[in-house]
Amino acid sequence: MEAKESRPQGFPELKNDTFLRAAWGEETDYTPVWCMRQAGRYLPEFRETRAAQDFFSTCRSPEACCELTLQPLRRFPLDAAIIFSDILVVPQALGMEVTMVPGKGPSFPEPLREERDLERLRDPATVASELGYVFQAITLTRQQLAGRVPLIGFAGAPWTLMTYMVEGGGSSTMSQAKRWLYQRPQASHQLLRILTDALVPYLVGQVAAGAQALQLFESHAGHLGPQLFSKFALPYIRDVSKRVKAGLQEAGLAPVPMIIFAKDGHFALEELAQAGYEVVGLDWTVAPEKARERVGKTVTLQGNLDPCALYASEEEIGKLVQQMLNDFGPQRYIANLGHGLYPDMDPEHVGAFVDAVHKHSRLLRQN
């Protein structure tokens, strides 16, 4: 079904739809697997490609993004590709300056400090037209993949994007962003609405360009407790999925599965399972069997091996994967890590993880 439906531009036919079938809740012969940050600095070829230009110049080069997206697939039999890009291209498209400082991470020289700073932001309706380079990268990559596996598009969720725009970069406390929530709730909602209005056409545009699934990253969910999350994050997470689905229908595009990954958002698992996403991503702090009890059979779960488990021996990785697969069960499940791969990880161990998922999930189905 899916392979034919999501070929808006006569792309090559999909040969491996295991990831999409699992996302839709259909039965699969084995458990599909991909890794967050699978296109990353742990690969020497990634570091080599990236050395040619600065980070955001790389993001703006469809050819470079395509090459980086395909690199892990040349090494490992992954069941999905995720486009190489960054969640901060959206604040950039809204007119904010963002630089990537080597060894430090993203930096906003002029973060949002006052309510009136919101006036500096561009009209969110123009954002998708500013991000044509992402759409070009997706189309090129989808063609180059030649139907090998599906291509995932992504974006950051409104609260997570807001934290960067207010904090001016990464933060261990998010105290400036949370100060906004407590001191300027109206302005906070205004900013979150602007971001939602920017994200919807951006995500619809990714599907129009060839993305076959979408993941929304609420990476900073854990900085909010249940109350703040249900007030300032969840309504926008819901709104994104509802409006993207409506936007796809309006554009005459087939529906694609959507994944919500709210890191450290275990306190809102039930709500996330009912937020309009086909897949809920889990970090490693959540016990799989407990998560399954809490969300029921209505959604697919994705995750959630501790990325640091890949520092273990290949034999130990196999045992940990086996345990994880037993805990999640064979169906309505996509294997992944509970967060992205770290730069100092051994590619051989990433391969061991992928192979172990395929091997043990097949054995699990035989028994």
From Swiss-Prot:
Pathway: Porphyrin-containing compound metabolism; protoporphyrin-IX biosynthesis; coproporphyrinogen-III from 5-aminolevulinate: step 4/4. Coiled coil: none annotated. One of its GO terms (molecular function) is uroporphyrinogen decarboxylase activity. GO terms for biological process: porphyrin-containing compound catabolic process; protoporphyrinogen IX biosynthetic process. Disulfide bonds: none annotated. Coproporphyrinogen I binds at residues 37, 39, 41, 50, 86, 164, 219, 339. One of its GO terms (cellular component) is cytosol. It is found in: Cytoplasm, Cytosol. The modification N-acetylmethionine is found at residue 1. It comes from the Eukaryota. InterPro entries: UROD/MetE-like_sf (IPR038071), Uroporphyrinogen_deCO2ase_HemE (IPR006361), Uroporphyrinogen_deCOase (IPR000257). It catalyses: uroporphyrinogen III + 4 H(+) = coproporphyrinogen III + 4 CO2; uroporphyrinogen I + 4 H(+) = coproporphyrinogen I + 4 CO2. Transmembrane segments: none annotated. Its EC number is 4.1.1.37. The record marks 86 as: Transition state stabilizer. Coproporphyrinogen III binds at residues 37, 39, 41, 86, 164, 219, 339. Keywords: Acetylation, Cytoplasm, Decarboxylase, Disease variant, Heme biosynthesis, Lyase, Porphyrin biosynthesis. Catalyzes the sequential decarboxylation of the four acetate side chains of uroporphyrinogen to form coproporphyrinogen and participates in the fifth step in the heme biosynthetic pathway. Isomer I or isomer III of uroporphyrinogen may serve as substrate, but only coproporphyrinogen III can ultimately be converted to heme. In vitro also decarboxylates pentacarboxylate porphyrinogen I. Homodimer. It is linked to Defects in UROD are the cause of porphyria cutanea tarda (PCT). PCT has been identified in a flock of German Blackface sheep. It is characterized by photosensitivity and porphyrinuria. Belongs to the uroporphyrinogen decarboxylase family. PANTHER family: METHYLTETRAHYDROFOLATE:HOMOCYSTEINE METHYLTRANSFERASE RELATED, UROPORPHYRINOGEN DECARBOXYLASE. This is Uroporphyrinogen decarboxylase. It comes from Ovis aries.
